[in-house]
Amino acid sequence: MDCKITVMRKTWYKDLSEKYENPISHACDLEEGQVFISKGGQKPQGLCESAWESMRFFVETLASGGGNFYDGWMKNEKSAMISCNDGFRPVSFYIESIGEN
């Protein structure tokens, strides 16, 4: 089964970044509304590695027909809302299974 991964929201905690982070030359270039399709639980091209590592378990579970994470967490049992591990620039992703039910 395939999964649709949608960038829902991104933010930047500028105060934390200025206080704790070393300057970086390239920040996240994902855009709100951007969509990725995971085929059979595989990492979609163009999705950053950090984000993938945060959502991989959920995508693989949905792709194999599972769901209902944390006993009723999501209104749609075949979905999850996950954020990447970047504490300075977190990005929230909505993941949902598509295709076969």
Regions found by a protein language model. Name each.
Residues 10-22:
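Short, structured beta-strand/loop micro-motifs enriched in basic residues and often containing a Trp
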Residues 55-101:
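Short, compact, well-ordered microdomains
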Residues 11-13, 42-44, 101:
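Short loop/turn segments at secondary-structure transitions that flank enzyme active sites
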Residues 19-43:
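Short, flexible N-terminal segments of the mature chain
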Residues 3-10:
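A short beta-strand micro-motif
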Residues 2, 35-37, 90-92:
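Intrinsic-disorder/low-complexity, polar/charged segments enriched in Ser/Thr/Lys/Arg/Asp/Glu/Gln
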Residues 43-53:
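Short, Lys/Arg- and Gly-enriched loop/turn segments at beta-strand edges
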Residues 1-2, 14:
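Short, low-complexity N-terminal intrinsically disordered segments enriched in polar/charged residues
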